[in-house]
Amino acid sequence: MSGNTLGTLFTVTTFGESHGPAIGCVIDGCPPGMGLTEADIQIELDRRKPGTSRHVTQRQEADEVEILSGVFEGVTTGTPIALLIRNTDQRSKDYGNIVETFRPGHADYTYWQKYGIRDYRGGGRSSARLTAPIVGAGAVAKKWLRERFGVEVRGYMSGLGEIDVPFVDWSHVHENPFFSPNAAVVPELEAYMDALRKDGDSIGARIDVVASGVPVGWGEPVFDRLDADIAKAMMSINAVKGVEIGAGFESVAQRGSVHGDELTPGGFVGNHAGGVLGGISTGQDITVSIAIKPTSSIRTPRRSITKAGDEATVETFGRHDPCVGIRATPIAESMLALVLIDHALRHRAQCGDVETPTPKIAGSAT
C-alpha cells in the first residue's frame, strides 16, 4: 500500500488501523519556530472524536494525542513531527460475522481482491477512524496558516438527508453536535436522526468549508492546480462521493454573464469561482462543499457474497455512525488546511519574490 502520503513540501503520512494498538501520522516539512503543544492539537481532535452525542458512534475513544518528535521546548524544530493516538475501545468481536463475507458499500471486497488479505476488524485501514490523524495534522496546518497569513479555515453542515440547513451565523456551529450554523434547525435534525436510528438505517450529509484570508497566488498549474489538489484531498476522506468548488454543479445552469466574477478597483463582484481561477487562488474566500454518502454499516439485512462467491446476507452489528457527516466538519477543515499550507510553502519557494505593478484587489467589492 503506497498511497498513504498527502502533500509535496508539507507532507502527512498516516499509519495504523481501526482496531490496532494505535493510529497516527508523521508530518514533514513544517516550518521551524512555531509554538506547538499537544493542547493545540487536542482541541481539534475533541471536535471530531466519537461518543460525543447519541447521534454518533458510541465507541468511546479519548483520542489523546502524543507528540513524539519534531517539537523542542514547545517549538517546532523543522524536523518530522510524529503524532500518536492510542486506540482504547476496540470491540473486535462485533465483526466476527463478516470474517468470510463482504459488507455492501464498504471496502471489504476491494481490499480483499487487491491485496489478498484484509483486516475485517472495523474495516482496518479503510476505517474512518484514520481521519483522526488527519485532524491532528490539520491542527498544525491551521495554526501556521493563521499565525503566518491570518488564514481561517471553518466549516459547517449545510444539509442532512432531505433537510437543508440555511447558514445563519458561525457562532451557532460550535453549540450543537451537528456543526449546524442554524440553531433553529437542530431540533429537526435530532428528531430525524432518532427516527433513522430506530429504523436501523443511515443517511448522508453535505459539508461546506470556507478558507478566509488566503492571498492571491497559491496554486501550481497545470496538474497541481489548487482546486485540483483540494478536490483530491476531499475525495480522500472516507465516504465522500462528490466535491464542489464555488458554484460547482450549479455552474451548468448559469450563463457566463452571471458566473464570471467581475473585477473592479474596489474588488471582485461575486465568487462563483470559489476563490480559484486557473488553479490559482484569487484572494477571495475559498469555498468547498462535499457530499458524504450514507453509512454502509446498517442493521438492515443486505445481500452480499462470501469469499467463496456464494450468496450471503449481511447485518452489521458494531458501533457505527448513522451519519458519518455529523463528525466530518473538522475533517474537511483539516484537509483544506493541509492543501493550503502545502501550496503556501510551494508558492514561497518559487514565486515568493514576485511583484507586479497591479494592486491586489479586495475579495469582495463593498
UniProtKB/Swiss-Prot annotation:
GO terms for cellular component: cytosol. InterPro entries: Chorismate_synth, Chorismate_synth_AroC_sf, Chorismate_synthase_CS. It comes from the Bacteria. The lineage of its organism: Bacteria, Pseudomonadati, Pseudomonadota, Betaproteobacteria, Burkholderiales. It is an enzyme of class 4 (lyase). Gene3D superfamilies: Chorismate synthase AroC. This reaction introduces a second double bond into the aromatic ring system. Homotetramer. Reduced FMN (FMNH(2)). The keyword Amino-acid biosynthesis applies. It catalyses: 5-O-(1-carboxyvinyl)-3-phosphoshikimate = chorismate + phosphate. NADP(+) binds at R48, R54. It comes from Burkholderia lata (strain ATCC 17760 / DSM 23089 / LMG 22485 / NCIMB 9086 / R18194 / 383). This is Chorismate synthase. Keywords: Amino-acid biosynthesis, Aromatic amino acid biosynthesis, FAD, Flavoprotein, FMN, Lyase, NADP. One of its GO terms (molecular function) is chorismate synthase activity. FMN binds at R125, S126, S127, N238, A239, G278, K293, P294, T295, S296, S297, R319. Belongs to the chorismate synthase family. Pathway: Metabolic intermediate biosynthesis; chorismate biosynthesis; chorismate from D-erythrose 4-phosphate and phosphoenolpyruvate: step 7/7. Its cofactor is FMNH2.
